[in-house]
Amino acid sequence: MIDTQQLRAEQLARASDVIRHDDLPFEQPAFIAGADVGFEQEGSVTRAAIAVMRYPSLELVEYKIARISTTMPYIPGFLSFRECPGLLAAWALLEQKPDLLFVDGHGISHPRRLGVASHFGLLVDVPTIGVAKSRLCGRFEPLTESVGSQQPLLDKGEQIGWVWRSKARCNPLFVATGHRVSQDSALHWVQSCMRGYRLPEPTRWADAVASNRPAFVRWQRQQAANVLS
């Protein structure tokens, strides 16, 4: 039996440690990574992928996938406890640690201000940004249909993120401070990693690596061809 009251208390305690201003060891990062977590075998296996990209070229330079036994069932509002063990396993495999990490999920845009981007950022002490595809909490004014339309995401009088339309005719992204990155900088860095898709390149590639999508298959073929040439 999962003690959600204990987990809730831990979330609140950890959330108080999140650094919400810029505490960045760079003027421009050399490497930005994306992280994505999924589940296999009816949820019994956690699959975590991290894709590291050189910045600003956004060239994929390293990726790692970790598969571990899932340690916790799905409980709404406590997803980071389920996802962080897999992310830690993938992180440990990386040879090139990134200067900045985008996580597919929420940062402080969480009812208790501890989404997976914030939780993981605290665990590894790296600047993180939450890039979520759906809203978990908070309210925002309607966006226009124009690319670049944005509104603050507000909850209980506090800005907890940005709602930003990254691509025409697509639902907006929910971008938020994870750890050691301010709200405005979080949006800036996500915007700087766009290449015409709905998702920024780091999390788009993390998803591609995790799911063996065509873009990643083509990249692997090109790498193999480069070795042979």
Curated annotation (Swiss-Prot):
A GO term from the CC aspect: cytoplasm
The organism's place on the tree of life at top rank: Bacteria
Subcellular location per the Swiss-Prot or TrEMBL entry: Cytoplasm
EC numbers on record: 3.1.21.7
Family annotation (Pfam families): Endonuclease_5
Record site feature (Interaction with target DNA), residues: 74
Protein task: DNA repair enzyme involved in the repair of deaminated bases. Selectively cleaves double-stranded DNA at the second phosphodiester bond 3' to a deoxyinosine leaving behind the intact lesion on the nicked DNA.
Protein name (record): Endonuclease V
